[in-house]
Amino acid sequence: MRGMFLTLLLACTDPESPLPSPVLGEPVHVVPSGGLPAQVEVQPSANNLDVVRHDGSVFFAFRTAPDHFASADTHLYVLRSDDETHWTLELPIFQGTDLREPRFLSLGDQLFLYFAVLGDDPLAFEPQGTMVTVRDAEGRWSEPEWLFDDTFIPWRARVVNGEPQMIGYTGGEDIYNADGMPEIEVRWLRSDDGLSWDAVVPGQPVVETGGGSETDYVILDDGAVVAVTRNEAGDEMGWGSKICRAEAESPGDWRCVADPRKYDSPLMFRASGRVWLIGRRNLTDDGNYDLGMRDLSFEAQSIQYELAYWQEPKRCSLWEVDPEALSVSFVLDLPSRGDTCFPSALETGEDRFSVYNYTNDPEGPDLSWVEGQHGETWILRQDLWFE
């Protein structure tokens, strides 16, 4: 018995023993599906989404519009379910302009939904700011109100160690403006009530300035922060992404390294003792967004990289992030194709998740990203676990 115990102990502590590997369940259709309420009018494009568990139910928000691009016909729907199959309409949102980035925050008996308001020009990215609506304990939603006084776009909202936090960015109107070096600000915020927000790092709401926009992060056991920022606009570090880290004693001092790949719509989480990322993958030989054309001007590079990226197929993928080396390794693709990747996930158990994502038909033709943006997209969910 003693020998068996020692063998098991050595196996558990052997650094050479294999680590748990990710496993994907079968995808399930959420949008469109027969489980949606009749009041929900699904248009060809269903994409930006979020999901959260609140008051014993699952709440799901998604955007639907004629296509991927900005539209005055955009609707947001908030649905509720007890089984993630049959859904009840909680709240429709329509404002005659584009709406994106729905983000939930469950706080006590209140559920907050933040969302970005943009213009309706399909050829422009025109952030107007963030609005919020609140569901009270009786299930009543408030009228949406403006939350910030600038063009802030929320990217993730969650409770971290008991504290509501949000990360997002301002200056998004510069992402597709190739005229000069951008000064987009990534802001890391905290709140006591979900409505009034200030800096996580006292006196320092901005943790990164440059070309970075969409950003997600995790907190390690030692309190260090590891983050992935989409750097589509480019800056002195190049284009693609930034992989960043800040130590617990100085959480506002982000040290970043450049990655030439662009992990659009980053979702970060921890499982099996490691750091994971779900984000878009460019289906080329090296996957790079930054093509290294340094003989061109900054403005010309920005245009060339964007045009090249639009012409390639995409996947929504699981990646592993090394929190020490600040490097990212490809792991596997979710069922995805064409216009895809705006993930959200529910934790369903230890190292188990229900992942929601949008895509063109994953069994259909391998469309370029721009082709897919004009096509029909679905929202799927599937289980992800580690064994």
PLM regions with names:
Residues 1-3:
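Positively charged n-region of N-terminal signal peptides that target proteins for export
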